Amino acid sequence: MTNRGVVPFGEQSWEQEAEGVRALVRQVDGARWAIVEYAPGSGRPEFCEVGHEGYVISGEITYEFASGGTIVAKAGEGFVLPTDDLHRGFNHGSEPARLLVIDN
């Protein structure tokens, strides 16, 4: 980081994480911070074991839990995905979903 306390995502290149899912990733004090974008109709095929906290910048994201159930977070809402419940994300909407995600 060039400016103490600032996380400069603009200096990163997009990384393809899954079909229709890409991310700008930074490591900040040992934690993974990412701007994640899900194209309309995209999702992750595998369940994730890592816990996350996040905020929906635009669009809408649905998280499905291996234990059953789902949550839907819309633009302007935050979410918490615990490490003890496997989960995976989907964008069932017609516009891209853009999120700020911090791994915990």
Regions found by a protein language model. Name each.
Residues Y38, F47-Y63:
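Short, conserved beta-strand element in jelly-roll/cupin
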Residues R88-H92:
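Short, exposed beta-strand-loop hairpins at the edges of beta-sheets
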Residues D29-E49, T83:
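Conserved short histidine dyad/triad with adjacent acidic residue
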Residues V80, S94-N104:
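A short hydrophobic beta-strand segment most commonly corresponding to one strand
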Residues M1-V36:
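A short, N-terminal "cap"/entry segment at the start of jelly-roll beta-barrel domains
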Residues S67-D84:
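Short acidic-glycine-tyrosine-enriched beta hairpin
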